[in-house]
Curated annotation (Swiss-Prot):
Name of the molecule in the record: Mitochondrial GTPase 1
Functional summary from the UniProt entry: Mitochondrial GTPase involved in assembly of the large ribosomal subunit. Plays a role in expression of the mitochondrial translational machinery.
The UniProt record lists the keyword Thylakoid: no
Keyword Cell wall biogenesis/degradation: no
Coiled-coil regions listed: none
Entry's family note: Belongs to the TRAFAC class YlqF/YawG GTPase family. MTG1 subfamily.
Top-level taxon of the source organism: Eukaryota
Source organism (scientific name): Schizosaccharomyces japonicus (strain yFS275 / FY16936) (Fission yeast)
Topology in the lipid bilayer: Peripheral membrane protein
An MF annotation (GO) of this entry: GTP binding
CP-type G domain location: 10-199
Amino acid sequence: MTTWFPGHMKTTLKRLRDSVSKNDVIVEVRDARIPLSSRNPALETLAANRKRVVVYNKCDLAFPSAGDLCKTRALNSVRAFEETYVETLARWETIQTLRRYVGTVSNVPECIKRLLQLLQKLTYSDHAASNRTVKVFVVGMPNVGKSSVMNALRHASLHRRKVAVVGSHPGVTRNVGEVVRLFEGKNVYMVDTPGIMLPTILQPEDAIKFALVHAMKDGRLHNAVVVDYLLYRLNLIDPNTYTRLSSPTNDVSTFLHNAAVHTGKLGKGGTVNDDLIASYVLQLYRTGFFGAFVLDSMEEEQWQQRLALEKNLVRRNQRRVCSTRKKA
């Protein structure tokens, strides 16, 4: 199954493969709501034999308790590469850093401080050894918050305003971005990159998850279909999570009608525009209206199945590349 993979993503991936040296650091940002689905085998290959930090962003929308977060940390330790570090961020922590001038280190959220310290550790040794330039490439799928993380780090480190464009829609960054200094007096720079999707969906449910968390542009899937999946997940968790919009139901048409009534969004003659109200419900989900929960299964068996699918995809791509070279 194909996914949203416009030309600039393919170009970006090729440029990254040509640009990232063994001394550089990869910061991969993932959406904590889909910690498994937002893994990208193409980025895994890019990070092989390089220092890498995996940042789970938007944790406030995913984890109601610290226990769930610890479980993600533990599962993430099943890495195929030598140096992988895990950090977690919430939306409010990056926003908090950007909204005020960080005059002292005590004003910086703890997670940002930890991430800065980790990047210092990973970059300073190589820099000191040869005074070479070290780049920190910030990568990940669309709309996981790469630019926000990058801006928060730079603002906390150098007390400067944001340098990367931030948007609420996937695909805001379309080219390998401007190289900006990360630490004062050091040749350590961050590079913003466009979000890169998988050219092929590994599991059918992934496409709906991507649409739900806005990793894909709205309209790629019908909004009502995405809300139908959301309703299914909410019913599994607790139907009381949406009682402000509707009484408990398994029928998405009934849910959308009730939501339109409760929010005053009925059209003329009491009609319901399913697409319009579905779009509104999706916006509510993306702001945490229904609470914090993870869309991916957190069971280790599911992680192992995912890793197997990723390996098969990588092998197919490698065979395709070899076949193309032989024909050339």
